[in-house]
A protein has these predicted regions:
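Bacterial N-terminal signal peptides that target proteins for export
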Residues: 1-9
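Hydrophobic helical h-region of N-terminal Sec-dependent signal peptides
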Residues: 9-16
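C-terminal motif of bacterial Sec signal peptides marking the signal peptidase cleavage site
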Residues: 18-21
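Bacterial signal peptide processing site
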Residues: 23-25
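Alpha-helical segments in soluble extracytoplasmic regions
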Residues: 30-114, 121-161
Length: 162
């Protein structure tokens, strides 16, 4: 009987190890897409909160930060578009890509407004910041619906320190 228990324990150990190995390595195209995009989003989130953060306010000097934010997000979007079809959840993925596109457009618009700033444009900039904040907030839930984790962490994308 003890030998049987030992064999059962070994077999169970192998089964558990095999199952754990399968769950940690992405197998489906959707899981590969999620892992690759989340890796990129992790870098984007660090950069948006680090060297590309707005700080106390937004000014003409931040145009280069906005350009870099746009470039990072476009690269993410292109990376995801080049990945194989996820097999399931395509509608949720398309919704997320659309929301990322809206946010990219908003950032690019803000960059142009900063570069062409004239006295009295403060209200225009404030309105665009509001549009961008709403767009950033829309990206997170759409990412979550598809299954992304890091790409859903958009809380500080439009954060201004107070």
């Amino acid at each position: 009987m003890p030998k049987v228990m030992s064999v059962v324990a070994v077999v169970l150990g192998l089964v558990v190890s095999a199952v754990a190995g399968c769950s940690s390595s992405p197998g489906s195209p959707k899981q590969q897409l999620i892992q690759n995009a989340d890796d990129t989003c992790r870098t984007i989130n660090k950069r948006f909160a680090g060297d590309l953060a707005y700080g106390q306010g937004l000014g003409a000097g931040d145009a280069s930060k906005l350009r870099e934010r746009v470039n990072l997000l476009k690269a993410l979007r292109d990376q995801v578009r080049k990945m194989p079809n996820p097999g399931e959840g395509q509608a949720q993925l398309d919704s997320w890509l659309d929301k990322v596109g809206v946010y990219i457009t908003g950032l690019d618009d803000l960059r142009g407004q900063l570069q062409n700033y004239r006295l009295g444009m403060d209200l225009v900039l404030a309105l665009q910041m509001g549009v961008n904040e709403d767009a950033a907030k829309a990206v997170g839930p759409a990412a979550k619906r598809f299954g992304f984790e890091e790409c859903a962490k958009t809380q500080k994308w439009e954060y201004l320190a107070s």
